[in-house]
Amino acid sequence: KKLDYIQSLGITAIWLNPVFESGWFDGGYDVIDFYKIDPRFGTNTDMVNLIKAAHQRGIKVCLDLVAGHTSTHCDWFKESANGDMNGRYADYYIWTDTISEKDKEEIALRHKDPNPQSSTRGRYVEIDAPRGKYYEKNFFECQPALNYGFAHPDPHHSWEEPVTAPGPQAVRREIRNIMSFWFDKGVDGFRVDMASSLVKNDPGKKETSKLWNEMRAWKDKYYPQCVLISEWSNPVEAIPAGFNIDFMIHFGIKGYASLFFAPNTPWGKSNANDGYGECYFDKAGKGTLKQFIDNFSDAYGKTKDLGYIAIPSANHDYQRPNIGTRNTMDQLKVTMMFFLTMPGVPFIYYGDEIGMKYQMNLPSKEGSNNRAGTRTPMQWMPGQTAGFSTCAPSQLYFPVATDNGRLTVSAQEKDKSSLLNYTRALIRLRHAAPALNNDGGWELISNVNQPYPMVYKRFSGGETYLIALNPSGRKVSVNIPHQGKGIVKLGTGKVSYKSGKAFDKIQLNGISSAIFSIK
């Protein structure tokens, strides 16, 4: 029902968080059946119908593939645990009867937690099963790790199989079968959860990279039109490993946090060791660009023409742009201009196009913990359920944060100056201008040591644009090497561009930004 709205934004692909049958202990990332849509969403037929309807509108559909583990309720795990060594799934998981004293201590400490099932502490789970006393987990106890083998098996640990062993090879075939099953139904790609962590004891990710290169070769042979997107967060590793797209997000290579995570937010606190102090996109104007620019420039230079870096506005795992004191439409327009003018593939998290806010202090549900505030219902219209559902408000998955109905699609559709319509304008310009699209060139023009404003160039052929961003609350200016005459194509706040012989001067009022076409 909402595909026409998505099409109206100019969106050409959607990524759905986990929709396969799940135990729902971790928001769908504990899969019971990879070949079945969870009944809470519908049926496999419903998914096929969604894909067909999306394709009719020029929208591709990508699904979430949790490749590293399953739910303990998965039939694979149940059969493996039963101890039939001739069973198909016997070696799909990592079982042992002996673990180190340190690992036993970790189990004991986890069990002292008020809710041990929600603790990610330790490596193993103790179980009374014919197959073994312990299995290796990835995160929660209900998420047993699939057995992709060990890059360097410990000769003293008989359960650590090499990647070439029958069990790990069978798991690889199963993952190909899953992808093939859904590709054949029209799915256009997969975002692979924690893609770098499949092979155990793999420093440098050499064997994990080999695995994904094999998957890529298989995909390119049989499904060349489909894409693989990794949650690796190190494009320099992920793209040569075979992925078409990798993210720069809240973990992995550093830089994203320094842009958006203020120290007094949950994610600012969790990234306190990143060494950036204040975040860049804050009206206090005390942030730095160096960490982001150094790491992005390195990754961009090493992966250009091989694949794409994606810098998402947010995702299900961390905060939205609208959080704390970054909460006005002008502030959010400056951040949206950044997301939609950088090279690579932009990802807009649902609701960020209307400025939905991260809702602080929500209770955890289905493993959300402090991620709950970024998983609230989409806000279509004013009201207690925001048009998301006709149910009673108390029955919603999480409560709505409508901000008195202002941050809704219906309110912003009517306002030509809204963030929603501004986002549409940015996407239209990105589609229309080759220099601004995924493949256009990129170069920082301003001085990284003078962070405000940030000015970068996008170019393709004879077409050039400069993007100037000032998220601080004060007026700023910068002199840059002469580029030409700058004409504002789109912007927010008061800006000016004065062209000189040797230098050009860009001036921006507080919380302002602009895209300049250079003539």
Model-derived regions: residue spans:
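Beta-strand-rich binding/interaction modules
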Residues: 475-495
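Loop/helix patches that line or flank the sugar-binding groove of alpha-linked glycan CAZymes
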Residues: 220-222, 242, 270, 291, ...
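Acidic/aromatic-lined carbohydrate-recognition and catalytic surfaces
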Residues: 1-170, 184, 195-243, 378
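Generic enzyme active-site microenvironment
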Residues: 62-63, 191, 229, 312-313, ...
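Active-site-proximal helices and loops of the catalytic beta/alpha 8
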Residues: 51-55, 68-69, 77-87, 91, ...
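Short loop/turn motifs at secondary-structure junctions
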Residues: 10, 30, 186-188, 312, ...
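C-terminal beta-strand-rich structural cap/linker in extracellular carbohydrate-active enzymes
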Residues: 498-519
